[in-house]
Amino acid sequence: MDRQTLKHLQDIYSSILEIEEFLCDRPKEFATFCNDTLLRRGIERNIEIMGEAMNRILKTVPDIPITSARKIVDTRNFVIHAYDSLRPDILWSIVINNLPFLKQEIEILLKG
């Protein structure tokens, strides 16, 4: 894997770790997430970074073995362009249900 792709994978991994850090001292509850604007904005920003990094990866490695690669880019685009209709429950679901698996996939690629 080329150096630039590894850098983008590391950017995604760093964003995941940052989101985990945001949540480590807070209850992992949807209500807490909804009531904390700073937390939501921090998560949104990291999702934007992950989506942009994935978009750059897909341009050079279109068959990267990441299950939801295209959805990550689509989510980034939605967060940026449809910010006024972004539903907190969808964002929360991504954090709780999708990030742990994505983290595993990225770790495998970074170790390989």
Locate predicted features:
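Solvent-exposed interaction patches of small proteins and small membrane subunits
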Residues: 1-112
